[in-house]
Design a protein with these regions (language model features):
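Cysteine endopeptidase catalytic domains of the caspase/legumain-like
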Residues: 1-249
Length: 249
């Protein structure tokens, strides 16, 4: 998640337009031998947890209920701006999720699950309430494709790291930390994204085509039947970047 967060910020999306949910405070975990740091790989070349990371929901706040309320706009009146998704019918939304999952579910905190039905109904409410124009949903988990199986709302693209019945694998273990630091699919996506700039013309089709099963050990799933444009005409920066536009009058 932090790798994707860094990427969209680099491409021009400010923290005011990003809502970051982190269930675990890995940077401050007493078992982390590098306090205050979360590395992108075992080579420790890039610290993803710098001074400019703004976590909007952390720890116990990361629940299925809070995610669904956030997406559908049903947050309490006292909720601060940083915990609200103030989108409208002109907004393009990128929704990225990762963690442990299975057939049509993703775990939250090892205590509850969000189902494919929950997600599909939330996105439909977003469409009915005019809370998005186009939506890109990316998920990296085991059997990721099943989380997109119940989607039925217009203008949605879904991409997952694995098909039904497949695992999604982690990348090389950092033996100093004792666990892998990133999943293979997300790593491959982020490697490609390093070549993308705010003014790049690369498309989602080019991004998806760059992902090979030999590198991820799983089969990428892409669903675009709900979308109204060919993927080779959709720029990556339509969802993961922002360029300020000035209208002269």
């Amino acid at each position: 998640v932090l790798g994707m967060y860094r990427t969209v910020k680099r491409l021009g999306i400010p923290d005011s337009h990003i809502i970051l949910m982190l269930a675990d405070d890995a940077a401050c975990n007493p078992r982390n031998p590098y306090p205050g740091s979360v590395w992108a790989s075992y080579k420790h070349e890039l610290d993803l947890y710098g001074d400019d990371v703004e976590v909007d929901y952390r720890g116990y706040e990361v629940t299925v209920t809070n995610l669904l309320r956030l997406l559908t706009g049903r947050v309490p009146a006292h909720m601060p701006r940083s915990k609200r998704l103030d989108s409208d019918e002109h907004s393009n939304i990128f929704l990225y999720m990762t963690g442990h999952g299975g057939d049509e579910f993703l775990k939250f905190q090892d205590s509850e699950e969000i189902s494919a039905y929950d997600l599909a109904d939330a996105i439909e409410q977003m469409w009915e309430k005019r809370r998005y124009h186009e939506l890109l949903f990316m998920i990296d988990t085991c059997q990721a494709a099943t989380m997109a199986s119940r989607l039925y709302s217009p203008n949605v693209i879904a991409v997952g790291s694995s098909l039904k019945g497949e695992n999604s694998y982690s990348y090389t273990t950092d033996y100093a930390v004792g666990v892998p630091l990133i999943d293979r699919y997300t790593r491959v996506v982020l490697e490609y994204m390093e070549k993308v700039t705010r003014t790049s013309a690369q498309t989602l089709q080019e991004l998806f085509s760059s992902v090979g099963e030999a590198r991820t050990y799983s089969t990428q799933f892409v669903r675009s039947d709900l979308f109204h444009r060919p993927l080779d005409e959709v720029r990556i920066t339509d969802f993961l970047g922002s360029v300020a536009q000035v209208q002269l009058t």
